[in-house]
Amino acid sequence: MGSFRFHEWLICEIETDDGIIGIGNAALAPQLVKKTIDTYLTPLVIGEDPFDYSYIWEKMYRRTHAWGRRGLGMVAISAIDIALWDIMGKITNKPVFKLLGGRTKEKIPVYASKLYSQPIKDLQKE
């Protein structure tokens, strides 16, 4: 787990049998998300083909059904899902947006908020 001064993050790494590492992240209650992944979701992912992402996602979704359809369970599933897409991109040598269907617009509007209240130089040092 890593952290900024004001916010903790969980970095989820999944390594394939071939040594390819996919990286996902979660920004809600990282200690609890880690426990959820380690205890409940990892056994559902080990040995699966990352390209069977819908099947894996459904297994994880059903496993967390009793917790509701938001919050901790969904954050944990999302961290794994992001890592699986990263693996697929690395295996195919394509950016994930291409795997998701490619470009849909000529231009994409950009949005930024003042989430980080420190100067960017200070954040880069962290």
Predicted regions mapped to residue ranges:
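A generic secondary-structure signal marking the coil-to-beta-strand transition
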Residues: 8-10, 20, 76, 106-108
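Metal- or metallocofactor-binding catalytic centers and their adjacent structured scaffolds
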Residues: 15-91
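Metal-dependent enolase-superfamily TIM-barrel catalytic cores that perform enediolate-based chemistry
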Residues: 106-126
